[in-house]
Amino acid sequence: MQTWQLPEHIADVLPTNARQLESAREQLLALFRVHGYELVQPPLMEYAHSLLTHIDAGLSLKTILVTDRLSGRQLGIRADITPQVARIDAHLLSANQGINRLCYAGPVLHAQPDGLPNMREPLQAGAEMYGFADIRGDIELIDLMLKSMKIADMGKVLLSLGHIGIFRALSDAAHLDAGQSATLLALMQDKDTGSVEAQVKAWKLDGMWAKAFSLLPRLYGGREVLSDARGRLPDLSAVGGALDELQAVCDAFPDNEIHIDLSELRVDNYHTGLLYAAYAADFHDAVARGGRYDGLGGYFGRARPATGFSFDLRSFIGRLPAVERQPAVLVDAEDAEAAREAVEALREQGQCVVIDYGIGHNVSEELAGRLKKTDGVWQIVKR
């Protein structure tokens, strides 16, 4: 194996793309900040039992585990930042009984590639709200997600909505056990209506519940899906409440194209209610995903309402606006010492100054000029 080779699905980010990513990251964090979201930076590695919450068993398949040479305990390299932020809210910020608005932007590592473009080291950025159960919190996060997509230059974005609470309400009312719910959930993900119907028939479910489960995969489309669902799904308070929340989101974004799918349940196991995602042209999958995950912090000692979204900023490289390198001022190597004061003054002003050793350089072809001493004063002489 060549010494320069990297592990599969791991890649370097070279200067041109690195400038794009860092510029977008700075803009995103500035956007989050003016909306009241405070930056947190959880560690890349934690004890495995902290990262692998019992709520999301699937996370263990993504997490790389190592042994800590100091303690002998098992460590995990984070595959998702949300459980870490839930820990921070539950433990380190527990003095605040009100709302915590938190955001982040950092790398995660996956044991296996998670779909296309098959990268194992996403740059996960996101925002989360803890301590507010009202649908207005979800609407605030969706608005922030859509604004984030503008920074990423996504163009027209489709807002997709779902609600796992509807499926769970039907499962509870039909008295399905955990295994049955998991089986039916998997069939829902595949939009396999025939298999759903065959499965509920095999379980000999009451006709009302069998009909409801068979109907869910067919309830998708525009805003009109909600009125259709109200007329066809069982009259359960939890189902009605979920539809009310979906309607509130639709009303909050009258100018956005919205797609509703009541069987779209492709979520991490910790999600509990409203689900939302953003789709853009030329991307095979959602460019951002979010939803409600009430109670996730309970694993760390404080269960609270929570909602948030995240996305892989690195997957946007092909779409991010170009960021040109700043034109540089060159100073001849033999003048560098004498011009030190002038050079540092320019750098403090934000000007890139590069020492020219006479063997070429990788600075921008559009040079700002060369630093020369003229009439006893160091000045930038244009080419």
From Swiss-Prot:
Reply yes or no: does the keyword Amino-acid biosynthesis apply.
Answer: yes
Q: In the record, what terms sit under GO molecular function?
A: histidine-tRNA ligase activity
Gene Ontology CC terms:
cytoplasm
User: Where found?
Assistant: Cytoplasm
Pathway recorded for this protein: Amino-acid biosynthesis; L-histidine biosynthesis; L-histidine from 5-phospho-alpha-D-ribose 1-diphosphate: step 1/9
The alphabetized list of GO BP terms reads: histidyl-tRNA aminoacylation; L-histidine biosynthetic process
Q: Relate the protein's function as given in its record.
A: Required for the first step of histidine biosynthesis. May allow the feedback regulation of ATP phosphoribosyltransferase activity by histidine.
Q: What else is known?
A: This function is generally fulfilled by the C-terminal part of HisG, which is missing in some bacteria such as this one.
Q: What family does this belong to?
A: Belongs to the class-II aminoacyl-tRNA synthetase family. HisZ subfamily.
Q: Give the protein name, as stated in the record.
A: ATP phosphoribosyltransferase regulatory subunit
What organism does the record attribute this protein to?
Neisseria gonorrhoeae (strain NCCP11945)
